[in-house]
Design a protein with these regions (language model features):
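Catalytic cores of secreted or luminal carbohydrate-active enzymes
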Residues: 2-70
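Active-site-proximal, structured, solvent-exposed surfaces of multi-pass membrane proteins
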Residues: 1, 44-182
């Protein structure tokens, strides 16, 4: 079996709709809308709506399989040219004809930090829990670095506890040596 509607990781949209508009749609057809439009919070629609076109009302009802396959083809056409997982997160490259939000179907987590062309950038929580970043026009590199919550604290505690443990172990080794002499 080969999925003819496969979409690579990392792609852009032409349209957006707000979470309220998305929630007002009929539940069985919502998944088709996710191929056509990026779902933004009301606040993100105000801040980033300039990079996308609001989804026309007529587009909310054209949810046929034929249209779905066309939406998949449109997303493939705007997909990243490179996507690689690495030990820290993932790396992607893309060429965009205009500034746009690059969407990744990776669950949003506060542990991620995103860099576009080496500059830290805001990660948007879109499509009810996935991620997107704003990218400028042209060829861009995108890096997401993941560091779990609490890792810095755990490293600090470990480093602080290490000397205490060494002193504790050293004391008992010294005490044991002292007892053997007597």
């Amino acid at each position: 079996y080969e999925n003819d509607n496969y979409i690579p990781m990392g792609f852009t949209y032409d349209y957006y709709l707000t979470e309220t508009q998305y929630e007002d749609t009929v539940t069985p057809t919502r998944s088709n809308l996710l191929m056509r439009a990026l779902v933004l919070t009301e606040e993100d629609a105000v801040a980033y709506g300039q990079y996308l076109t609001p989804l026309p009302t007529a587009e909310l009802n054209d949810l046929t399989y034929t249209r779905y396959t066309q939406d998949c083809a449109d997303r493939r056409a705007s997909a990243c040219t490179t996507f690689e997982m690495n030990s820290a997160g993932f790396h992607a490259e893309a060429t965009l004809d205009r500034a746009n939000l690059m969407f990744f179907s990776v669950p949003y987590d506060d542990g991620f930090t995103a860099y576009v062309d080496g500059q830290e950038t805001e990660i948007l929580r879109v499509d009810e829990g996935l991620m997107a970043v704003l990218c400028p026009a042209g060829t861009v590199t995108i890096d997401f670095v993941y560091q779990p919550d609490g890792i810095r604290l755990s490293r600090t505690v470990t480093l602080a506890a290490l000397p205490v443990f060494l002193l504790y172990a050293g004391y008992f080794a010294w005490d044991e040596k002292k007892k053997r002499k007597h």
